Amino acid sequence: PSLYEAKYVIDVLDEQPDMNLLKALGKRTAITTAGMDVAITSKADQQYDCVSRYFAPVAGIEEDPVTGSIHTAIAPLWAEKLAKNNIIAYQASSRGGVLYCNVLNQERIEVSGYGKLYMQAEIFP
């Protein structure tokens, strides 16, 4: 993914990416999604260390509500900038959420948080 660091939280909150352009720049195949998934992040104030949003329209996800995997890239960035290993991140989508990230080293990041049941289904054989 492309990771963009914004200067201000308001830049993250106000971001309105051109989904059609991101789709056109990316390419989806039966096996992989290549191309334009984008995360935007900035330093947060007080309650959180950083705030982020994540867009992946090529994969059929215009904006993902809370994305643990993208925070394996975001957390080390802020761990280094803030000189701390435990990062509290807020993903500011309409269903947003808090992620607790522990940067053990550049290869290992633990991400945790609280979940809510969004959907339930049964699949029959």
Name each model-derived stretch.
Residues P1-P125:
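Active-site proximal loop and beta-alpha junction motif in alpha/beta enzyme cores
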